[in-house]
Amino acid sequence: MPIQKPCAFINARSGSTSDITEPLTAKLKAKFESIGPVKYVEPAKMSEMISATIEDGCDLVIIYGGDGSALSAAKLATEKNVPIVALPGGTMNLLPKTLYDTVEWEEALDTALACETPRWMAAGDVNGNTFLCGCIIGTPTRLNEVREQIRDKHFKEATEDLIFNVMNFKSEDVFEYALGSSPDTYHEANLLNVICPQMSDFDTGPGGLEVNALDVDSIFDVAGLGLSAIASDWRENDHAETNISNELHVKGSGKIDILLDGEPTPMTLPLNLILIKKGVLVLAPN
């Protein structure tokens, strides 16, 4: 069934967004008889507003922000079988690049709206938490908070956290992981990079999660860690081991640091990661 009533939200705090409410509204009104809200909003209010517009009958959620913003919108929309359009307004924009092959929001929107029907896209899940691009597991992910503080010009806090992480990083802080639904062999690593099929340039066959396990020797080896790590070719690293699997288990107890689509999301071990073939509805070409 064709889209009848789209709505759009612009994350005011994403890496490269600006207030495009006027041109975005004009483009939507030129194509649809009825549209929902087109709002430039603070992140704290976005989830509530998206839920309200879906309840009000909007059947497409357009999100202009980063990959984390797209993830938040996708989780709310997919629960109601409503597709999303992820416009590139963040730092990395991995999802829009993959779906629409552009970093220009107007081109991405035109490509999306030219599609007649939405389609399912695979996603990953770790302990009930969805990710659309990738999941990075291990203590070195704490440096992502330093990166965000620098981007927000919180230099004092960033310096303090960097010193703390350098002083407390231990390369021997390893955990055990295993592949498959009934694992009998566990391996050791202190950093795992799990990439969704659509983000991987590796041959995943019929579709699977790309799992890169690394033994990071020094915190300086991951000084630039963030969402960009999902796009990096970690397979060239001498300490990396790459596998494809629909399921991954991580042993242990206590807290562990995780990045989901670039967003810090600490969790409690053990972890169970699975591929969800129908993970999120998107309005995008096949």
Label for each model-derived stretch:
Residues 56-58, 166, 279, 283:
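Domain-scale detector for complete catalytic domains at protein termini or as standalone homologs
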Residues 7-9, 13, 40, 79-85, ...:
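Catalytic core of DAGKc-family lipid kinases
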Residues 206, 213-286:
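ATP/nucleoside-binding phosphotransfer catalytic cores, i.e., glycine-rich phosphate-binding loops
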Residues 10-12, 65, 215:
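Short beta-strand/turn micro-motifs composed of small residues
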Residues 1-61, 71, 75-79, 107-109, ...:
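ATP/NTP phosphate-donor binding region
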Residues 23-26, 78-79, 148-149, 227-231, ...:
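Short, solvent-exposed amphipathic alpha-helical segments in soluble enzyme
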Residues 69, 123, 262:
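Conserved Motif II region of HX4D acyltransferases
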Residues 63-65, 87:
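Structural motif
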